[in-house]
Amino acid sequence: MSTIIMDLCSYTRLGLTGYLLSRGVKKREINDIETVDDLAIACDSQRPSVVFINEDCFIHDASNSQHIKHIINQHPNTLFIVFMAIANVHFDEYLLVRKNLLISSKSIKPESLDDILGDILKKETTITSFLNMPTLSLSRTESSMLRMWMAGQGTIQISDQMNIKAKTVSSHKGNIKRKIKTHNKQVIYHVVRLTDNVTNGIFVNMR
């Protein structure tokens, strides 16, 4: 299983390499990459099954973010796992935001990686056909409300602007927290901004 790791943190690289080796991936199939340009070349030449990327490698540069977005779109049969660079927050979940793009906490447990990568570790096949989890999506109301929430508007302001009861606003907030698997506002905002950065944003159900 060809794998690429793009993370400037040596501890993370060591941890991921150790995990992959313990699951039967050969050392020669694990490649460390440092730049987005090198990642594009490696993805074209190696057609990796999985690419691990730390968002710190691209998030601070708009052109790098666009390039990452392009690479993800160009390789639909590669699973890209992007680690959130968010400190001092207890969050060890992961979210599928596109068929081949998963946003994850760096605190993800080995068992969770097993759940995600289990089938691809056993079979030489495209990972995206095995991912048995729903893609994160919001209703139109949830999406509009989340933008207002992120803009610093409170429940009463959102209630007035959307012409819905405050209780309904709270209910929508509860749904958003459930879907993003956290009650931490900082994590929610981070997930939204990162998704906006490397895709066209969280899917919105137009129904």
Curated annotation (Swiss-Prot):
DNA-binding region: 155-174
Disulfide bonds: none
Keyword Transcription among record annotations: yes
Keyword check for Transcription: yes
Segments forming domain HTH luxR-type: 131-196
InterPro entries, per the entry: RcsA (IPR030866), Sig_transdc_resp-reg_C-effctor (IPR016032), Tscrpt_reg_LuxR_C (IPR000792), WH-like_DNA-bd_sf (IPR036388)
Pfam families named among the record's database cross-references: GerE
Signal peptide, first to last residue: none
A single GO BP: regulation of DNA-templated transcription
GO molecular function: DNA binding
Keywords, ordered alphabetically: DNA-binding, Sensory transduction, Transcription, Transcription regulation
CDD domains recorded: LuxR_C_like (cd06170)
Homology family: Belongs to the RcsA family.
Complex and partners: Interacts with RcsB.
Function text: Component of the Rcs signaling system, which controls transcription of numerous genes. Binds, with RcsB, to the RcsAB box to regulate expression of genes. Involved in regulation of K30 capsular polysaccharide synthesis.
Protein name in UniProt: Transcriptional regulatory protein RcsA
Native organism: Escherichia coli
